[in-house]
Design a protein with these regions (language model features):
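N-terminal export signals
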Residues: 2, 8-24
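N-terminal (or domain-start) structured segment
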Residues: 24-112, 177-203, 297, 323-326
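An extracytoplasmic/periplasmic, membrane-proximal ligand-sensing/linker region
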Residues: 30-32, 265-326
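Residue-level signal for nonpolar/aromatic packing positions in well-ordered secondary structure
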Residues: 33-35, 42, 49, 66, ...
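Sec-exported extracytoplasmic/periplasmic mature domains
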Residues: 53, 57, 61, 82-86, ...
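Hinge/capping helix and adjacent helix->loop/strand transition within the periplasmic-binding protein
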Residues: 83-89, 103-192, 241, 254-287
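A ligand-binding cleft/hinge motif common to bilobed small-molecule-binding domains
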Residues: 96-106, 165, 169-176, 199, ...
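C-terminal lobe and pocket-closing loops
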Residues: 122, 211-280, 309-312, 317
Length: 326
């Protein structure tokens, strides 16, 4: 081999050695990622975001920091996700309200305002009362609601026109009452609503039982029923509306992860694959099961189709409930 040839090989080898770190440096993520949560700390959406962030951090080797951006019945946080730079360093957990808010004229955002990454959770609502409430079962509460004056009783659970509000409206209508017979007090999520319930600020809260669990276990509230086809195995003593009232009414919230539109395909694919690993991880399964949160998986394409169906269904439900505008 000539000296020139040897020099050529050495140069090529050095170039290859330099190229390898360059390729590695191009891998996503290279710095911390922000996960925006549109709802308050301690609620089901916040808890789901934080366990996912913790496992993503281990999986992808960079911090994933959850930031709560509340307000506007969910509009503030959902807008922040949609308006983030499409570089993968700000993503978010989006909720069923994104299929509802635009029907009320609160925002122009729809499920198609995002790059879907993965669907990871679905939960039905429960009906909670203060621990000192005279109502020990759902029939007693239902009778009291029917006997009350319009607007006399107050309820909370999420923002105006949010999924837990719609759950209450549907239940009232199923009992033959107007959807606004119980006055809705908007909140930034289930956690602050449950605190308000425990303090006596409202008469009942509709939210998932897992979201209410901390206040219930502290002896400050109790759950009377769930709006689901069957009982939650983590809360076997909480009956369904159908069992107790003969009302076959159920609904639920969903949560998934998304980025802004035009997120690069490589980054979106990396995140969806990582979220799939999170979903199948022991940490996520044990966390969700221990709290009674539902686990539902959909990849990016499945999540997009799921949101389209949810958008149509919520539009129909909100028009029927008189909550839609236009």
């Amino acid at each position: 081999m000539t000296t020139t040839s040897r020099r050529g090989l050495l140069v090529a080898g050095a170039a290859a050695a330099l190229a390898r770190p360059a390729i590695a440096q191009g891998r996503y993520p290279q710095r911390p990622v922000t996960i925006i949560c549109p709802w308050g700390a301690g609620g089901g959406t916040d808890q789901t975001a934080r366990i996912v962030a913790a496992v993503l951090e281990k999986d992808l080797g960079q911090p994933f920091n959850v930031v709560n951006r509340t307000g506007g019945s969910g509009v503030v946080g959902h807008s922040a996700i949609a308006q983030a730079p499409p570089d993968g360093y700000t993503i978010g957990i989006i909720t069923v309200e994104i299929a509802m808010m635009h029907w009320q004229g609160l925002t122009q955002l729809t499920p198609r305002s995002y790059t879907p990454l993965a669907l990871m959770n679905e939960d039905p609502p429960g009906v909670q009362v203060n621990a000192s409430s005279p109502h020990r079962d759902i029939r007693s509460l239902a009778d009291a609601i029917k006997a009350s004056r319009p607007g006399q009783l107050k309820a909370s659970g999420t923002g105006q026109g949010g999924i837990w509000h719609l759950a209450l409206v549907g239940w009232l209508q199923a009992m033959g009452l107007p959807g606004d017979h119980v006055r809705w007090v908007p909140s930034n999520g289930a956690a602050p609503a449950m605190q308000d319930l425990a303090a006596g600020g409202v008469d009942l809260v509709t939210c998932s039982v897992p979201e209410a669990r901390a206040i219930i276990e502290a002896g400050r509230a109790r759950s009377l029923a769930v709006m689901a086809p069957q009982r939650n195995p983590i809360f076997p003593d909480v009956p369904t509306l159908k069992e107790t009232l003969g009302i076959d009414y159920s609904t639920g919230a969903w949560r998934g992860f998304a980025g802004p539109l035009n997120l690069p395909r490589e980054i979106a694919s990396t995140l969806t694959a990582a979220l799939d690993r999170v979903y199948r991880s022991n940490e996520y399964i044990e966390f969700m099961n221990a709290r009674g949160f539902g686990r539902t998986w959909g990849n990016a394409e499945e999540f997009a189709a799921f949101m389209d169906r949810s958008n149509r269904a919520m539009g129909e439900a909100m028009r029927a409930a008189g909550l839609a505008r236009g």
